[in-house]
Structure formats: C-alpha cells, structure tokens
C-alpha cells in the first residue's frame, strides 16, 4: 500500500470513489482466504493505469533532472577479472558510434521479451535486450519456461484489452453464446487467473466452439455494461476496439485470443535488486555492480504464475529497494573500478561481423522464424514432443545468427543494424525458454504440458504438479546451452510460509 500512496502523492490520477478514497476493481485471481471469494483490490486509473504511472514517474525524473541517453542502445555488459560489472557498451543511434559507459553500478530495467513470440501484447522494443546482455556475460537466466498468456489480446492484432474489462463485468462467450467460464471456474468465472482462463479459451476453440468463420477466437462481451460505464471506466478499450477490430464495443462483442503477455522468469536477483549467480557452491552469490528490476528480473515474487497488477507493484517496490541499495553501494565505493583491456571486444566482434557481411540471412527473416517457432512450440498448451522439436529448431536458428547480413552499412539512424543486434538477444531468450520448458516434465503455474496433466485430486501429482522432483528454479546458461537448478526459498522474511496447494476457482 505504501507505494500506491507514494504514487498518489506524486500526482498519479487514480480513479476515486464518491467518498474520495482510491477506486479499486476486481481483477483475475484476486481473492480472499486463498480462493474463497473474489475481492476488489486493484487500484486503477480508468483503463490506463500503466500509462498514467509511466507519465507520473517520468515527471518525477524531470523534477530530479535525470539524464536520459535517448536513442541509444545498450549492447553488452563489461565484467572485470573478478566478475564484477564495471560498465556497458552502447551504440549511439544518431551517429552509429560505439561508446563505453564506465559505471560503479549498472541497473537493467529493459522490460520483458514478449517479442520472441509471433503474437504478443508487448511493444516492439521488448526484444529481451537486458536478458541477452546478461546471458552473453555468463549470467544464468532463471525460470524462463514460465510465460503468461493474457486471455484478451485482440484477435489478429495482439493488442491488449485490459483485464479491467472483466473486472468491470465483461464476459467471455463461445460460438453457442455460452458464458463458458462458469463451467470451468464456478466461483471466479471470468476472473479466474490468466493462465487458467487462457487454457479454457484454448480448450473451447480446440473443441470446435470458437467463433468466426474459422472458429479460431472467443468473443468478449461488454455492451451490457452500458456506454456510460465503458466511456468512463474503459475509454482506451473503446478506442482499441474501433481502431484494431473495427468494433464498437458499446454495441457488439470483440474477438479475442490468448496472447503472450509477461515472463515470470528473468535475470535472478535478491530483494535488493542485486543480480545473483551460482559461484563456489553458493546459489545466490552477488554479482557486484549489477542490478535488475521489473520484468527482466526474477526475484522471484511471482513464482510460476503472476497475478494481474502485481507486475507494477513488483517494479515499484524493487525499483525503490534497488535505488536505495545502489546509493549505499556507491557511497561505500568512491572510485570506479578500472575497465579491463578487453572491455569492448565482444561488442566489436558483433559489429564487425555485420560490417563485413556480404550475403546471408536478413535479420527480419530470422526474427520472424524465431517468433513462428516459439508460437508453435511454446504456446498455451504444450506437449513434450512439440517442445523437443522446438529445441531442435531453435538450435538450428541459432546457427544462422552468425550469418546475419546487413545490406545497408550506413551509420546514421540505421534501424536495420538495430534489428540485427536485437536478433542476438531474441535468440538467447528463445533458446533459454525452449530448453527450460522441454526439461521441466510436469505442469506448474503457467507451464502446462498435456503429457503430464492429472486431475486435482491425484494423490501424487495434483493437476500434474510434481513437487518432489520439480519444485526448484531452472537456471539456463548460454555458454554450452546447459541447465542447472537451485532450490526454492520456502521461508519468506516477513510473512508465514505458504506451501503449494491445488488451486480452486
């Protein structure tokens, strides 16, 4: 609650109740007493909460006179002989020049990597740059098999329709006009957790109850809410309907499909935002000088499946914690550590490969192949055979990365060069996801594998979950494309431990 009040004091335009308190709406999976009943817990600014928060925090940066390097792209981390991070290499897009930025501390806040999939709610910039930088620097990526599909992406466009739609009372319908979530989740109905709703939608489509000429989408019905409520509480959703689906949601339902939205995995960190690694037999050894916050990090407060609204809380809480710790670290370390002699070697090798290329694969083509492979083999419902095939395909695509060619060798604002450099990040995240997913032979959270599904009352593996063998974090290393594991922390610092149990809705 403290960060919500802090945002409000910064000027965040939260919706208000008649008594002046901050408006809260129901959201998927938000319940009292571990699933007993739904509650109104999500603070909202109409259907633009994230957008409003972005502007509110940016205004605070302007106030603090933060120096932004606009239209620069960070390329690689610089680690010294002891493994400490002492800076980054970066490309200035306006000139095409390569720079070394020496730093006492580097914080990765690069967001998710949803653009490794063909259909994604993520912005085009979300190509996993921070994760790629960490992986190339020898840092493991944690729990990359766990990806959240949002139930309501606009069919054919991927644009997100906020969960606030269903929080305000919108319902999902199949081709029979049936509110089918009542069958799957009698208590929470359309506001069951996202992974569950996405799987139910996928099931309806697979069983022939999808809508449209190809029976390949579900309908989200909002018109019963009334035009006044829609324009007041869901103005952006109305605009999205008109612009991306040619639908007036005050009069007719809008086609939606489950769409990739969020990664639960990322760069492993502790509660201070410090990046941690396995070193000398210690699972969470701190990488000095390196922090990660937000979707690119894996603390892991979301476990295998995030609840709606918790990502913004995550980045606010741990962003603040990281900021405080960085100040302490910098106060204790007055001098910069020297840069190693090979500080820019990895980056120069990547850039020289593009500069010297005369023929080969276009970056856009390779990126498209990566996305198509991930969409096909790491979707809502997974099978062991499909994932194993995906591992082979991604390995073949990785072999093609070295042959990416750059026809336009110009320096100034060369977006083709940026896209080619982004492919290096896409392939790291895609391979981490595919290999980690194929190795986890159970169902847990957002990772549901058809081969391992069991009923909720199964004595050993309820809903396919195998705690004895698989209640552990996955660690994927780029070098050698290898996996390792570390135990889950079952002892929280300030609350009672909550053991895994069967989810009921």
Task: Report the location of each language-model feature.
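General beta-strand structural signal in soluble alpha/beta enzymes
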Residues: 14-17, 68-71, 100-102, 108-109, ...
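Alpha-helix capping and helix-loop boundary segments enriched in small/acidic/polar residues
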Residues: 48, 94, 98, 117-125, ...
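Glycine-rich loop(s) and the adjacent beta-strand/alpha-helix scaffold that form part
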Residues: 105-159, 206, 308-325
